[in-house]
Amino acid sequence: LTMMKSVSKEIINDCLSMDPIQTAELMTETNDFYYCPYIYGFSNYSRNNYRKNILKYIDVLDLSGKGPSGTHLGGTGIAVSNVSKNKDLAIEYAFWIAGAECQKSLFYQSGGQPGNSEAWEDEKINLETNDFFKATRKTLDLAWVRPRHNGYMEFQDKSGDVINEYLQTEISAESICEKLSDMYNKSFKE
């Protein structure tokens, strides 16, 4: 938190109210910004002709001596409802769309961001995304997977507001850590 606070003093105030997509849009539609140390990876912004400018993604900074770790891996997956009337067909579809061949072809070609590791290593995909997947692979491998319990997404949304408040005021890092810890523990009870 203290590192974030020192970095926050060097950025434009708009950054404190922007989400990751707004940040990517700003960086790809203007020539005013060169570097963003932490941003969600959206591979489409690395594709030629997606926006005015291309975002070149790389692994996050190694501040721990353990590699580019500490980020979280999220995203959208696919599941089959237990009450589906076509469970077998739905399961077959889920395996197909998550499989390497679909992820490397139709899924990617339709603008999707592959989650399959074989697609991450695909030469054509990396060529077309300016090495997005190769250049961030260590970060992906060392990321922790976002928790999946029911209250987590609300915690994530609200914790960002708490951290943002810390960055803009004189509240102590210790009190923010206590507040975040309480919020996280309560996220399991919802």
What positions do the PLM features span?
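Surface-exposed helix-capping loop/turn segments at secondary-structure junctions
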Residues: 9-17, 105, 170-173, 190
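Solvent-exposed, acidic/flexible segments
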Residues: 66, 70, 86-90, 152-156, ...
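Long, aromatic- and glycine/proline-rich binding clefts that accommodate carbohydrate-like moieties
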Residues: 108-161, 165
